[in-house]
Amino acid sequence: MPNEIFTINLNAQAIIPEAFILLGIVGTLLVDLAGEKTASRWAPVICYISLGSSLVSLAFQWSNPVNNAFLGSFNSDNLAIAFRSIIALSTLISLLISWRYTEQSGSPIGEFAAIVLSATLGAMLLCGSTDLVSVFISLETLSVASYLLSGYLKRDPRSSEAALKYLLVGSAAAAIYLYGSSFLYGLSGSTNLSTIGVEIINKPSFITSLSLVFVLSTVAFKIAAVPFHQWTPDVYEGSPTPVVAFLSVGSKTAGFAFAIRILTTSFSSFDEQWKLLFTILAILSMALGNIVALAQTSMKRMLAYSSIGQAGFVMIGIVSGTQDGLSAAVLYLAAYLFMNLGAFSCVILFSLRTGSDRISDYSGLYQKDPLITLGLSLCLLSLGGLPPMLGFFGKIYLFFAGWANHQYLLVVVGLVTSVISIYYYISVIKMMVVKEPQEASEIVKSYPEIKWNIIGLPPLRIALYTCIAVTALGGILSNPLFKLANSAVSETPFLQDILAVTNNML
């Protein structure tokens, strides 16, 4: 009988998608041992098979989720499936745009792919972790791999500096999480997130509030929310651009998945407190992220501050605490995947051809490279929330959900900062399109001939076309996509009780 109970509670099929990622890690490391030529040929194929199999298995799990696996330490519910799918897809696109960059930098491709897949594994496990211990293991798997990726260009001092800064701040965030977790365990006698929520209902104290602040600090670090954002611009500027592309979507998505799960389960009785703190973080992130982005001269730093502001928009949906709000947050993260990675695809392509990251060097680019100009323009307009782009509908759903939940201040700040973001996005577009031939930058004047048959460029082209198409045409499918996100929220058991209480309060 005990063996039967153990078998039932284990439910190992819940992590089949992660198992495919693990096999991909092993495969890429093995081909890396066979030599650089073998790795260059087979590492991408292994990654595609691994991530494709993971996405297919997630699709099969959608209709048959596993809500209690590994003795209650992992849930493969619909919300976790949605977030894990976003992360796996972001990794696939990030790898497509990274092969040429990695090849040109002279870095081992197999090793790079293995570390990216390791970060993906940690991020996906974090989305479904329901135990303080499994959360920490997943968090550290993601973090350590991210540190390695940030410093992957060993010969570039900026990359090493970025990795060191990321390591120091990330280690502090991990220590803060452990300290907060120790308080939660001491108060509840359990490491299970749901059990903690039940045990601390009648134990409001300074220690409980302190644990909330510590855990929320870790969440804010992962999603790069103000004032825990200081690492973001420096790490984004110094790290390899494909790594930045992955971190801006994959790591942020995992952070939001973790935030929703721990705040709505362990701190469900502190609903007002964490929503107040999240509101402050959202306002600061939207305001500072978009205002400081105005003054940036580096494209990567501008996108770094932009990502801080985008995190603030997603937080509007989480603070609303309603089914529509959480659904809008999921939808916007899915839209952000294509908008942001599309923009980074253009930045990578431009840097491969020119070696420059300065915004001023994009001046007059339309005359030499219409594809990058069109792609970057569409993605930036979508990030700004202009119709009929996918980003516009994502923001509309977030603002409507916030307004319906009486989050008027958040919505007003969101609207104002969206207008500010449109200004600096359009400034870049204007620089690329409007300039006369004689006003083009020196780099654009000597722009090299475009050759798409070079190793690594065809996958980048596929990723760029995909992101442009989804960003530009995704608005047409915004309603079906929102319904899909809505079903992910409504069919997740741990959210049903929370949503019922919220609906009764409205």
UniProtKB/Swiss-Prot annotation:
InterPro entries reported in the protein's UniProt record: NADH-Q_OxRdtase_suN/2, ND/Mrp_TM, Ndh2_N
EC number: 7.1.1.-
Enzymatic reactions: a plastoquinone + NADH + (n+1) H(+)(in) = a plastoquinol + NAD(+) + n H(+)(out); a plastoquinone + NADPH + (n+1) H(+)(in) = a plastoquinol + NADP(+) + n H(+)(out)
GO biological process, one term: ATP synthesis coupled electron transport
UniProt GO MF annotations: NADH dehydrogenase (ubiquinone) activity; quinone binding
Residue stretches spanning the membrane: 14-34, 42-62, 79-99, 108-128, 132-152, 167-187, 206-226, 240-260, 276-296, 302-322, 330-350, 374-394, 409-429, 462-482
A Gene Ontology cellular-component term: plasma membrane-derived thylakoid membrane
Keywords: Membrane, NAD, NADP, Plastoquinone, Quinone, Thylakoid, Translocase, Transmembrane, Transmembrane helix, Transport
Bilayer topology annotation: Multi-pass membrane protein
Source superkingdom: Bacteria
Signal peptide: none
Subcellular location: Cellular thylakoid membrane
EC top class named in words: translocase
Principal place of residence: membrane
PANTHER family named in the record: NADH DEHYDROGENASE (PTHR22773)
Subunit structure of this chain's protein: NDH-1 can be composed of about 15 different subunits; different subcomplexes with different compositions have been identified which probably have different functions.
Annotated family: Belongs to the complex I subunit 2 family.
Reported function: NDH-1 shuttles electrons from an unknown electron donor, via FMN and iron-sulfur (Fe-S) centers, to quinones in the respiratory and/or the photosynthetic chain. The immediate electron acceptor for the enzyme in this species is believed to be plastoquinone. Couples the redox reaction to proton translocation, and thus conserves the redox energy in a proton gradient. Cyanobacterial NDH-1 also plays a role in inorganic carbon-concentration.
NCBIfam families: NDH_I_N, PRK02504.1
Protein name, entry field: NAD(P)H-quinone oxidoreductase subunit 2
Gene name in the database record: ndhB
